[in-house]
Amino acid sequence: MRVSQFFLSTLKEAPAEAELASHRLMLRAGLIKRLGSGLYTWMPLGLRILHKIEHIIREEMNSSGALELLMPAVHPAELWQESGRWDVFGPQMLKIQDRHQHDFCFGPTHEEVIVDIARREIKSYRQLPINFYQIQTKFRDEIRPRFGVMRAREFIMKDAYSFHADLGSLEQTYQLMHETYSRIFTRIGLKFRAVAADTGAIGGSGSHEFHVLADSGEDAIAFCPDSDYAANIELAEAISHGILRKDPAGVMKKIATPDRKSCSDVAEFLSVPIEQTLKTLAVIADGRFYLLLLRGDHQLNETKTRKIPFLSNFEFADESRIIAKTGCLPGYLGPIGVKTEIIADRAVLEMSNFVCGANEEGYHLTQVNFERDLPLPVQVFDIRNVVTGDPSPDGKGMLEICRGIEVGHIFQLRTKYSEKMKATYLDESGQTQILEMGCYGIGVSRIVAAAIEQNCDERGIIFPVAIAPFQLSIIPIGYHKNLQIQAEVEKLYRACRAAGIEVLLDDREERPGVMFADQELIGIPHRIVIGERNLRDGMVEYQGRLDKTSRLLSLQEVIPVIREICGG
């Protein structure tokens, strides 16, 4: 491809609203153009990248035995009402009416549609297992679209749905999809981790997320560098350090702590480590008042807490309800002398000589100890986020925390949708059984942004070769002024194309600095620079975008060298 025949639309500066590096660079490189809030046009350069990702996904999904189909983007309300999600999915669902006032939605996901297909078409166990997938546009009305295509309202997704006669078959396909996803992200060239995850609103039992590792990631991931353990921080179990409580170091004292409400402020004021303070949170569930106890440096994990049956719908108590129940302001709450149910995190049981609220405004208690000043909590659960240095749940080392961008998610849905929508089959004995179901999603358009977050520098994007818009760029210096340069450039350009190398020739009548800046911005990983001085010796300069290497090659070496470093 010649730049003169291509649409290259780069910007020197990104719009002010672009927060993430990927958003800024995608706009500057002309990969996307904003149409409206959370709505983007994929320009020719960006679409080449998107198509390459889709091609890799299709190859691996087809290789796994999955069958591609394409379902409608617009769904009749009746299907969603049947599953019970029409009223509970929330405002993210874009609901519309046709000219006959019939209700529809623009599909945020396709479980209902695929289950409708399955119940119509799957009659016998002989048709199972089967796995359908599509690459389709979806719409979710995000309250605050941001970060470009990372959290857009309209996005492209690969979603697959498998149907099975029994749980064993589902688990086999689930493992197959886990392996398939790992191959997909490896081929794309991403550094990623598969992590155990919460099933969330989709529901079901087993669940894993696939995260591209990036400092800008919204999700926190706990992993063990000495093993394969990795989990979303919402799900990672906090294992006890096995610390024995110390003997009391002194009598309990009430200390004035004026205007010190947070654990960090109290710790600083009293010159004690924050882990020696006790955090007391007030919550209400089903009309009952509870105090949650955590170590001062630990954060409440709401996902874990909601898995405690009697706290499944808890909400934080506001100041007025706290005062009405305890007579004390938030910030000075503590577990001593209160007549309310107490729920403690496991780590709290290892505390001794700690600081807690005195249930009196402006005061805290110091040198507090269990079994002397208050009884040990009876109701103890894992309700905190893990932190770096916690023991790994698999017993093989210590946890570390990193950030990740979720690009894939797989679920064992079991019968969550098939039972509600009466999707059944006849087993070997002729008995009617409910279909077991799996669900497997990849954020196709999101992968582009995630890859950029992981592969960029101050000059622009550095795409992995597998998804780069072009494998090689040719920058001729003096192309329009030197006939010899022009002839050699054209010869090399034709040879690259004949060899199957995806090449972009910058044949514009521009200053070299402009051409270099554009090529570095748009993310082409390899570059050949042809100038008069080197050409006299039959040489050209190769420049690697990723490793910033530079070396001279003879004209005859260019094709074999580029083919080798591009993997073929």
Swiss-Prot record:
Entries under PROSITE patterns matching the protein: AA_TRNA_LIGASE_II (PS50862)
Record flagged with keyword Protein biosynthesis: yes
A GO-annotated cellular component: cytosol
A biological process from GO: prolyl-tRNA aminoacylation
Pfam families: HGTP_anticodon, tRNA-synt_2b, tRNA_edit
Reactions it catalyzes: tRNA(Pro) + L-proline + ATP = L-prolyl-tRNA(Pro) + AMP + diphosphate
Statement: the UniProt record of this protein carries the keyword Aminoacyl-tRNA synthetase: yes
Family matches, as InterPro entries: aa-tRNA-synt_IIb (IPR002314), aa-tRNA-synth_II (IPR006195), aa-tRNA-synth_II/BPL/LPL (IPR045864), Anticodon-bd (IPR004154), Anticodon-bd_dom_sf (IPR036621), Pro-tRNA-ligase_IIa (IPR002316), Pro-tRNA-synth_IIa_bac-type (IPR004500), Pro-tRNA-Synthase_IIa_type1 (IPR023717)
Annotated keywords: Aminoacyl-tRNA synthetase, ATP-binding, Cytoplasm, Ligase, Nucleotide-binding, Protein biosynthesis
Quaternary structure and partners: Homodimer.
Domain notes: Consists of three domains: the N-terminal catalytic domain, the editing domain and the C-terminal anticodon-binding domain.
Family per record: Belongs to the class-II aminoacyl-tRNA synthetase family. ProS type 1 subfamily.
HAMAP family on file: Pro_tRNA_synth_type1
Name under which the protein is recorded: Proline--tRNA ligase
Organism the protein comes from: Nitrosomonas eutropha (strain DSM 101675 / C91 / Nm57)
